[in-house]
A protein has these predicted regions:
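A hydrophobic C-terminal alpha-helical subdomain
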Residues: 64, 235-296
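Short, amphipathic alpha-helical "lid/cap" segments that border enzyme active or binding sites
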Residues: 52, 56, 97, 183-191, ...
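Short beta-strand segments at enzyme active-site cores
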Residues: 106-112
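Oxidoreductase cofactor-interface core, primarily capturing Rossmann-like NAD(P)-dependent enzymes
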Residues: 1-25, 29-32, 36-39, 52, ...
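Structured catalytic core of nucleotide-sugar glycosyltransferases
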Residues: 16, 67-69, 281
Length: 296
């Protein structure tokens, strides 16, 4: 069973599972387009993390549950029907685990965040932490995948990185290094863990290069020939913004708080947790070349 299959990561997990010949059922929220999933051969069932009864029906007869669902991606795309962090990422995930336990599911694969972000005080990160704790207390075999930042998200205009125009917003000092990872690589990892005979309980996966935002800009400049104009947002401004936004918009407030946490120290995610699964991770330079070639 896959929950979150219409999202950025979930759609790629579905494709990887289908390619491996796995019998797949996907939970699709009412009103969402599941044609691409049907084309993969997946069985669709209507459900919502806010509707425990629908989750019980979805889990019936299932061996393994994989979930990538969250409210942030949909919210940033303008979907105001997706629900809140409290209802979906905290209570919804807890309800899904309960449904899986009741149905006798054997394994639960969950996408999470690095531990440093879980300690950020961001509501979204706290929901991830609560779900990890709930899984640890469960009788189900759990596999937690803590992923570093997605290349497709962090090197996009959505977060102020406009490589075409040569403009970038740097939050905080911009010195801490992350292992920016391809969504496809994370998806292939989750698909592999869903069917592995004896998977590890925890993986902390990242890309092959430890890079600061300035390092990443240098790579894009070398590939595209475009220098960057940088707008830096100081940490005190971010702190005030996180407190102000957190009161009116917990989702955007969470993003700012997690950005503050990521700016404090280098990521502990490991490329070895990808390569151990037989995955050759895509580098940031490869991604920059891919984007550059797509526009020529």
């Amino acid at each position: 069973l896959l929950v979150g299959g219409t999202g950025l990561l979930g759609g790629r997990v579905a494709a990887a599972l289908a390619e491996a010949g796995v019998d797949l059922r996907v939970v699709v929220r009412p009103g969402r387009d599941g044609q691409a999933l049907s084309a993969l051969g997946a069985q669709l069932c209507t459900g919502d993390l806010r509707d425990p009864a629908s989750l019980s029906a979805a889990c019936a007869g299932i061996d393994t549950v994989v979930t990538t669902a969250n409210v942030i991606g949909r919210h940033l795309k303008g979907d105001r029907e997706v629900g809140s962090i409290a209802d979906v990422d905290r209570a919804g995930n807890a309800a899904l685990i309960t449904a899986a336990e009741t149905a006798g599911c054997r394994r639960f694969v969950f996408i999470s965040l690095p531990e440093a972000l879980q300690r950020s005080g961001a509501p979204f990160a706290e929901a991830k932490h609560a779900t990890e704790e709930r899984l640890r207390a469960s009788s189900i075999q759990s596999v937690v995948v803590r992923s570093d930042a997605f290349q497709e998200l962090w090197f996009s205009k959505d977060v102020g990185f406009d490589w075409r125009a040569g403009r970038a917003i740097v939050l905080g000092k911009g010195r801490a290094r992350q292992r920016f990872v391809a969504v496809d690589d994370v998806a292939r990892a989750m698909a592999a863990l869903a069917v592995a005979p004896d998977p590890p309980a925890l993986l902390e996966i990242g890309g092959p290069d430890a890079l600061s935002p300035y390092d990443a800009m240098a790579i894009f400049t070398a590939v595209t020939g475009r220098a960057f104009r940088v707008v830096r947002v100081p940490r005190p401004v971010l702190l005030v913004a996180s407190q102000t936004l957190g009161r009116v918009d917990p989702i955007r407030g969470s993003l700012v708080r997690m950005s503050l946490a990521a700016d404090e120290a280098d990521s502990v995610c490991r490329v070895e947790d990808l390569t151990s699964l037989g995955i050759r991770p895509r580098s940031v330079e490869e991604y920059a070349r891919l984007l550059s070639h797509a526009t020529t």
